Amino acid sequence: MTKIPTLSQRLCSIWGYAIVLATMQSVSLNAFAVDEMVRTEKGTLRIQILAEGLDYPWGMAFLPDGRILVTERTGSLRIVGSDGLEKKAIRGLPEITVRGQGGLLDLALDPDFVNNRYVYLSYAAKGKDGIGTEVARGRLDDMRLEDVEVLFRATPKGSGGRHFGSRLVFDPAGRLYITLGDRGDRPRAQRLDDHAGSVIRITADGEVPKDNPFTGRPGARAEIFSIGNRNVQGASLHPDTGELWSHEHGPQGGDELNIIRAGVNYGWPVITYGVNYMTGTRIGEGTHKKGMAQPLHYWVPSIAPSGMTFYTGDQFPQWRGNIFLGSLKFRQLVRLEIDGERVVHEERMLEDRPVSYTHLTLQTTSP
């Protein structure tokens, strides 16, 4: 985890190892001085700075050698090593469009990365009808991506610069989940002929799994796994069930925590616990409707959630099974205690520090 001491809330920040590198010997990035100790409800954390100088970092992944791959929304793929941020960026990326909230967004390593060296990237890209989310993969060879190929293009594209979604998560079967926002055009999230406002599931090679819920339905895009999602920017697999849990941004209020299941409609914009910006007026039909899922948990006022992971390590047994996510709005680390499919407690940590949390990864041992 990283504290950003200067510049804007989202500039030059990066989440790093294990809830703030609580022990120096548990990680390979041990060249940085301890910055401060922070008390929480269940223990004291040590915060370290891992890297500075990043430009809107958005996604990250740990390489087998302990280095960290980091995406910068402005279009660069960087490496953080034992001496901090490496000067040169990785070359060979696909063509990326930086506009509004769009740019180079998330990344994930192939489950067989040790053998095939595939890195998957989500990003905004231009098309004949506008811009939209795409996913490509390339083989990492030293400081370059080789054999880059586009595996998925969100269709149709749009003209705005909002709500690209873009989290990437592999499940145990090697299928890739891609979260997509509604692109600022609310009705699109309820359409099966439109990728916007949905969660996508494809194979690692970009094919449609045979058991996807809308495969074979006339007019539906077979890649769609769920619909009615406003803008999912945090997703993680439950360590016991293997199901995909996610959170998404609401409008003014109504950020949600959900379990993403096949064929489920999560309601946006027909139902929501949020209201319209500025006017505070109701959106859609209220908060409930038959055939549309209720969130497991929601936030009013919004916290602007970002990044998400379940803690599964041994170093902090009191947190095992808890969800951690960042709050962009309040500049906090949020911890959720889970009982089955219920949130039973919430703790806000690292309050009022000059940093926003754009991504969160917890790791208690070196890769």
For each of these PLM feature ranges, what is it?
Residues 2-17:
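Bacterial N-terminal signal peptides that target proteins for export
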Residues 32-186, 234-250, 301-339, 345:
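Acidic, Gly/Ser/Thr-rich repeat motifs that build Ca2+-stabilized beta-propeller blades
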Residues 134-142, 194-204:
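Beta-propeller blade signature
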Residues 200, 259-288:
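Mobile, glycine-enriched helix-loop/loop "lid" segments at the mouths of ligand-binding/catalytic clefts
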Residues 344-357:
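Conserved blade-ending motifs and adjacent loop-strand segments that build the rim/top face
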Residues 358-364:
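Conserved small/polar residues in nucleotide/adenosyl-binding loops
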